[in-house]
Design a protein with these regions (language model features):
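Exposed beta-sheet edge and beta->alpha loop/turn motif
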Residues: 83-136
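Bacterial N-terminal signal peptides
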Residues: 7-15
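Short solvent-exposed beta->alpha transition segments
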Residues: 28-32, 36-98
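Positively charged n-region of N-terminal signal peptides that target proteins for export
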Residues: 1-5
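Bacterial signal peptide processing site
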Residues: 19-23
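Exposed boundary/loop context
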Residues: 10-11, 34, 95, 105
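Generic signal for short, ordered secondary-structure residues
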Residues: 13, 24-25, 98
Length: 136
């Protein structure tokens, strides 16, 4: 009797292990997870990988657009953030440039071009921080 339950238990453990394919324990893994979410069209989840400051800035812009439209615009901040975004190019390399406390910078090589991305560590892990680029 006990032996027949073992395969079901193993199957359940394998299924649970596959649920968490995204990682946020390092700046590189957080960026990789964010990139994968965007590529898969998982924009609501990808929005959750943005830092709290970035989400606040996007929400403020979304509210300003709603106010200007007289309340006719019904889009959520995450929808506005990713609206008209092209499919991201494949990333060929992600390198940690620096990590100082809860702030890190990674160098992302994509389509032969490199750019630096800032990340911050929050309670749930590393997050993409674009708040400086969203300032008016």
């Amino acid at each position: 009797m006990r032996l027949s339950a073992l395969p079901l238990l193993l199957l359940a453990l394998l299924a649970l292990g596959g649920c968490s394919k995204y990682r946020f324990d390092t700046p590189q893994s957080a960026y990789t997870s964010f990139h994968e979410m965007v590529k898969r069209g998982e924009i609501k989840q990808a929005y959750g990988v943005l830092s709290q400051d970035t989400q606040k800035a996007v929400a403020a812009r979304a509210q300003a657009l709603k106010d200007v439209s007289g309340g006719n615009m019904k889009s959520e901040p995450y929808e506005l953030f990713f609206m008209n975004s092209a499919q991201p190019a494949d990333v060929t390399e992600i390198t940690l440039v620096r990590e100082e406390g809860d702030v890190a910078t990674v160098r992302v090589l994509s389509s032969g071009q490199a750019r630096e991305v800032r990340l911050v560590r929050e309670a749930s892990g590393w997050k993409i921080d674009l708040s400086d680029s969203l300032k008016p």
